[in-house]
Amino acid sequence: NEAESERRRDLALRAVTAHIATVDRIESAARQALSGAVPADERDTIAWVERGDRDARYEVNAAPFEVGDFLRAALFARTPSVVLTSATLAEGRSFAFLRESLGVEAAQELIAPSPFDYRRQARLFIAPGNLNPKDRDFAQKAAPIVEECLDRTSGRAFVLFTSYARLREVRALLAGRLTFPTKLQGELPRAALLDWFRATPNAVLFGTGTFWEGIDVVGDQLSCVIIDRLPFPSPADPLVAARIAALEARGRSGFEHYMIPSAIVRLKQGFGRLIRSKSDRGLIALLDGRALSMRYGATIVDALPPATRIADLSALDALWAEFAPLRTSIPKD
């Protein structure tokens, strides 16, 4: 009846009004938190609010987008000597990006040769230049390449993505097609996933950022690393946006001086999952055709370890023949 309808409309209006009031309170609290998180004299600090993926909690973050002054005062000026060492500190043959990022003005530099024979141990396959991760049909075109790579290496692979959305899309396209044991990041805790991968013959792990670095799987158990795209930082990240803006305010290209060096370092980290000993061998497959079609692609690829480039995945047969054959037994589920 009309009275009942009026009552329901009134309840709905009250609910909407209460929700709007809640949003206003959250916005007001966030503004107050942000204003308190960054002192007025801290111009090099950026603050932002993040919301949890699975709940309604909000988190206020603040960080300096240039850490050089802080490190000079807190570390370099107080310590007689500081040694910075890693396999991926340099982008190519230069420490310029790292030095500028950390505010290092004077330092002795050393780029030591690798103990690995990458030309003999590793093959690098880059997808055709018309394969662009920005295209709508990228996943549809990339999935068959992923499938062929996995068939050629009998699984034993990390398939690394820069986003969960792309990971899920490609995995869905391969559902029912892969004969190898597979797991996706998030199905188990990270440590449990690694234990599963190391213990499972012919395993395939689909992962994102957390598996790009700090992972050590020696031997044929990891014989293939597939990377979906050139890992440029996201311009939507507040710190990335601030650093790009700071560079461009000084008349420098944010893409050239920040995005490209960042992608090089990140790609080298992903590459580094493959060859962990002098007896390792395997395939790095980059599915981003921009590495071939764009001018900056050569800069990025040339900074990688000198693996032998292949244009056809059938060239892997010679690599497997040179080393001990892969075990191809696939466990029954």
Regions found by a protein language model. Name each.
Residues 1-333:
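ASCE RecA-like P-loop NTPase motor cores
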